[in-house]
Design a protein with these regions (language model features):
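A generic structural motif
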Residues: 11-13, 89-91, 96, 123-125
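A generic secondary-structure signal marking the coil-to-beta-strand transition
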Residues: 31, 82, 151-153
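Pre-Walker A-like glycine/lysine-rich segment at the N-terminus of P-loop NTPase domains
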Residues: 2-52, 175
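A general secondary-structure signal for short beta-strands and their flanking turns/coil
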Residues: 2-3, 17-19, 81-85, 96, ...
């Protein structure tokens, strides 16, 4: 699995209001990025952003279907629209991919609701530097080629889960 995450960009994702960008280490000798912080400051939300961007899934205890920043949603007026967006730039087998998942939220009669289905786009840079979009029918295949969902738990985990990775057999099963 030859994958290197370059950047994570979040727009209004849960407690991250506005644009938040994280640049990850791409140094071949120092390619591990550790995110430290106090409890409730967003480390787990960063992991959830990866899962949502790649697979459209989150695992939040409170309001798991509502990803828009709460403060921003409280300020919305009738007819206004806001977006939640997560974009990941990743190098996979020498090709740079940009994966972007977007959810629009509308305020109608004082209620803020997300549109029924988030959109996902995947593009990649060709050797000549031009960006090409992946066909919608191939998006899931491309994402699973970059990082199969079954393996994602071994790449994106918080320290509380380290002890739950019980054996190499678990990893071997996920790889199969």
């Amino acid at each position: 699995l030859d994958m290197l995450i370059k950047t994570l960009r979040m727009e209004n994702f849960r407690q991250f209001r506005g644009t938040t960008k994280v640049d990850f280490s791409c140094d071949p000798d120092k390619n591990v990025t550790i995110i430290l912080g106090d409890n409730t400051f967003g480390k787990t939300t960063l992991l959830q952003a990866f899962n949502w961007c790649f697979y459209g899934k989150v695992n939040f205890d409170q309001r798991p279907d509502f990803l828009l920043n709460y403060e921003l949603s409280e300020e919305m007026r009738n007819g206004e629209q806001q977006i939640v967006e997560v974009e990941i730039t990743v190098l996979h087998d020498g090709t740079e991919y940009i994966i972007t998942r977007t959810q629009r939220y509308n305020c109608t009669n004082g209620n803020v609701r997300g549109e029924s289905v988030p959109t996902i786009k995947v593009s990649y840079k060709q050797e000549d530097g031009q960006t090409e979009s992946v066909k919608a029918t191939q998006v899931d295949n491309v994402i699973n080629n970059i990082l199969p969902e079954d393996l994602s738990t071994y790449f994106f985990f918080d320290t509380e889960r380290v002890s739950s990775i019980s054996s190499r057999r678990d990893v071997a099963e996920a790889v199969k």
